């Protein structure tokens, strides 16, 4: 069994102190790391929206749906809605803040025929404005349906009203 002598205790204390100082110098504290993380953008988070669609030319209403979106740090976006899951996939894409303070999200999802065969892709462009309190948003939507050859077959427009989910 090893006994601690004053010399071994001093060496242990010195090596422990050296290790603690090295960890601190390398960013071992939350304070050191927090200074390097940029502030979150106000749009980041989980949102629920209500969307009203219309024919872009005539303005005739085409129905609507409720949707969920996650705007992630760094500009990634993921969205889904309450439309039948067998008709479409989840929407993925990107978002960015414009110089005017509005946001543009570009998303895409796969569309399917009733028998499950591929029908093409849907491309969405959402232009969003956050309220001053950061808890609600409004926006416009432009949507282009593409066939399996990437030819435009339908264009739909819409409006969106959303609220942040959680804090």
How would you describe each model-predicted region?
Residues 2-13:
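Bacterial N-terminal signal peptides that target proteins for export
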Residues 39-61, 91-93:
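Tryptophan-anchored aromatic micro-motifs
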Residues 66-71, 91-97, 122-132, 141, ...:
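Hydrophobic/aromatic beta-strand elements that line small-molecule binding cavities or substrate pockets
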Residues 12-24:
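Bacterial N-terminal signal peptides
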Residues 100, 141-167:
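Edge beta-strand at a domain terminus
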């Amino acid at each position: 069994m090893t006994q601690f002598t004053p010399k071994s205790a001093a060496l242990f204390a010195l090596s422990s102190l050296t290790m603690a100082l090295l960890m601190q110098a390398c960013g071992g504290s939350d304070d050191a790391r927090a200074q390097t993380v940029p502030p979150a953008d106000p749009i980041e988070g989980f949102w629920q929206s209500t969307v009203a669609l219309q024919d872009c030319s005539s303005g005739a209403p085409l129905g609507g749906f409720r949707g969920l979106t996650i705007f992630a740090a760094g500009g990634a976006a993921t969205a889904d809605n309450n439309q039948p899951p067998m008709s479409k996939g989840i929407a993925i894409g990107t978002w960015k803040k414009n110089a005017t303070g509005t946001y543009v999200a570009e998303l895409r999802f796969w569309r399917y025929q009733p028998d499950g065969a591929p029908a093409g892709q849907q491309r969405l462009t959402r232009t969003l404005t956050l309220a001053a309190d950061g808890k609600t948003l409004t926006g416009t939507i432009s949507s282009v349906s593409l066939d399996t050859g990437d030819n435009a077959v339908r264009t739909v427009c819409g409006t969106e009203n959303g609220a942040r989910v959680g804090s």
